[in-house]
From Swiss-Prot:
InterPro entries: CynX-like (IPR004747), MFS (IPR011701), MFS_Cyanate_Porter (IPR052524), MFS_dom (IPR020846), MFS_trans_sf (IPR036259). It is a multi-pass membrane protein. One of its GO terms (molecular function) is transmembrane transporter activity. It comes from Bacillus subtilis (strain 168). This is Uncharacterized transporter YycB. PROSITE patterns: MFS (PS50850). The chain crosses the membrane at residues 12-32, 48-68, 80-100, 101-121, 134-154, 168-188, 212-232, 248-268, 291-311, 339-359, 367-387.
Length: 402
């Protein structure tokens, strides 16, 4: 039996490692939106091509998410997460060379690395902290959103002040990945989350109605998040806001999401059904999007961004919390995480591309914002199904007899 002091040290490094992996799951993506106009001008891209660049990590998520649980079973979640960080670092270095082909290839690699973390961290948390997944999901999602917000805010100032422009600004996030790699090294000797003790028929989860509710909720909240990260800076610029300020306003949106990001999983963990939480966050989100559609002064636009951020923070943290709440064990959590983030991110990948395409066709941001509102309404409906007190493989009869 490990000495209590050693156990505390191991727990410290595990929690620190989870936090630093979470730090890396968004900045390489959210740093792109504020400087997309500079990239587009330098590399002569259309809005559609720029939208595809933003969607590329999501396509990587969609392809890799079903494979990540299987890789975790083979290598262990700890080693697979470390491998994901290595791939992320290589992607950041490749993208920062500035060549068009390298930009797209590096971005795809970044998506592969992040996909592994996206899928396996909820499973690892479910395994390591089965009695208190809510607080750990809060810690994980809040850490993720802090650096997502920071990356949005500092991208333009860094690109402006550095000789290498946006290329050198992107390179800085490689240092964060390297730091996480080093911190996670103590976990490499563990394989206890390799999920070898139980077999789960991967095909069965696709027949679960509850799994589909969670997947659609996950997919549409991602659709909304990544569309906003990609195009809100441009929407704000259309209201007369300069590029740097637009970047900081998107950053403000993400910082505003932090309280709801942290509190939502804790609250969701304490109630049997999460349908009321879904209704509340969807209502707040809707107010913000309708406000953005209406426009207004710079101050009013900042208020709409804050309101959107509150809804956004709740939706991402609740989506991740539902993976654990609707699963009976770590194996089910890994399978549900893989499904929801595969089909879900495939759906999300359509967002930035289609929003860019709609703007190219209409030369107005009205229809793209209306599309986001429609996606939010469907997300709320799926959330009502996902918020019921039921496991993914639990029938109504089993639930009533429990």
């Amino acid at each position: 039996m490990p000495h209590p002091h050693n156990k505390k040290i191991q727990s410290f490094w595990l929690i620190t490692g989870i936090i630093f992996i979470a730090f890396n799951l968004r900045p390489a993506i959210t740093s792109v939106g504020p400087v997309i106009s500079s990239i587009r001008a330098e590399l002569h891209m259309s809005n559609g091509a720029a939208g595809f660049l933003t969607a590329l990590p999501l396509l990587s998520f969609a392809v890799l998410s079903p494979l990540a649980p299987k890789l975790g079973q083979r290598l262990g979640n700890e080693r697979t997460l470390w491998l994901g960080l290595v791939i992320l670092l290589i992607g950041v270095l490749t993208r920062s060379t500035g060549y068009t082909a390298a930009l797209f290839f590096g971005t795809a690699l970044i998506g592969v690395g992040i996909a592994i973390g996206n899928v396996l961290l909820p499973s690892l948390i479910k395994h390591k902290y089965p009695e208190k997944p809510g607080i750990m999901i809060s810690l994980y999602t809040t850490s993720m959103n802090i650096f997502a917000a920071l990356a949005s805010g500092v991208s333009v100032p860094l690109a402006t002040q550095m000789n290498g422009g946006w290329k050198q600004a992107f390179l800085l996030w490689g240092g964060l990945a390297l730091l996480a790699l080093l911190i996670w090294i103590p976990q490499l000797r563990h394989r206890d989350t390799a999920n070898q003790t139980m077999k789960l028929q991967s095909s069965s989860i696709w027949a679960s109605k509850m799994a589909w509710y969670v997947t659609i909720f996950m997919g549409l909240q991602s659709f909304l998040f990544y569309s906003s990260i990609a195009w809100f800076p441009e929407i704000l610029r259309s209201h007369g806001i300069d590029t740097a300020t637009a970047g900081w306003m998107v950053s403000l949106m993400q910082f505003a999401s932090l309280p709801s990001t942290f509190l939502t999983p804790v609250l969701a963990d304490r109630v049997k059904q999460q349908r009321g939480i879904v209704a509340a966050l969807a209502s707040v989100y809707l107010i913000g999007l309708c406000g953005l559609l209406a426009g207004g002064s710079h101050t009013l636009l900042a208020i709409w961004m804050i309101i959107i951020g509150i809804g956004q923070g709740s939706s991402i943290s609740l989506a991740l919390t539902l993976i654990g709440l609707r699963s009976e064990n770590a194996q089910q959590a890994a399978a549900l995480s893989g499904m929801s983030q595969s089909f879900g991110y495939l759906l999300a990948a359509v967002g930035p591309i289609f929003v860019g395409y709609l703007f190219d066709q209409t030369h107005s941001w009205t229809m793209p914002i209306v599309l986001l509102i429609a996606a939010l309404i469907v997300m709320g409906a799926a959330g009502q199904g996902a918020g019921r007190d039921r496991y993914i493989f639990q029938s109504e009869k089993q639930r009533n007899s429990a």
